[in-house]
Amino acid sequence: WLIERFKIERKRFDRSGVYAYTQRAMAYNSNKIEGSTLTPEQTASLFDNGTLPVNDDYYRAKDVEEMNGHFLMFNYMLDTLEEELTENLIKRMHYELKSGVFEDRANGYAIGDYKKRPNMIGMYKTALPKDVETEMRQLLDWYHKQEKSMKALAEFHARYESIHPFQDGNGRTGRMILFRESLKYDELKPFIILDDDRSKYLEGLKEYREHHK
């Protein structure tokens, strides 16, 4: 029923229901985990009206661009919910998130495609650009053979973040996949990772990386 509710409220431009609440909560928390400076109020204003409150302090243009990109990525996720999770679908999620971000485009980052330059998570080396496609294919092949469970989803997410397939936006696309899959399958319950749980969440990913080298 939740998927139908999302679709109905989105079509009606309803800003008072569960669709708008989830859009705001997910965009705020997922971007905040990555260092966004926008508040819940600013996030709500952007989603509801496409503007920021008049009396606001300074804010970073990139934070606004990524917040708007997150709203678009959520809508794309809803539109493609019945499709199988594929590399192309994940790349398109990344495109929705990042195509309007000036800084990423100015830096020559691949948008909607896998990274062209090596990147790291702290001191941890992620998959090299030349290996990303193979590792992503193996990960998706593995995932589609699993019984759908929170355990399989958690392992998928940890492996995805360890690969770090994109130049930037890996956490946000990864958490959107978590939400998508938990929304899609009856065996699972949809959830949002909160910024309040950031340290526990990052610690869990770190633990996985260290024990599954």
Predicted regions and their residues:
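FIC/Doc superfamily catalytic core
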Residues: 1-213
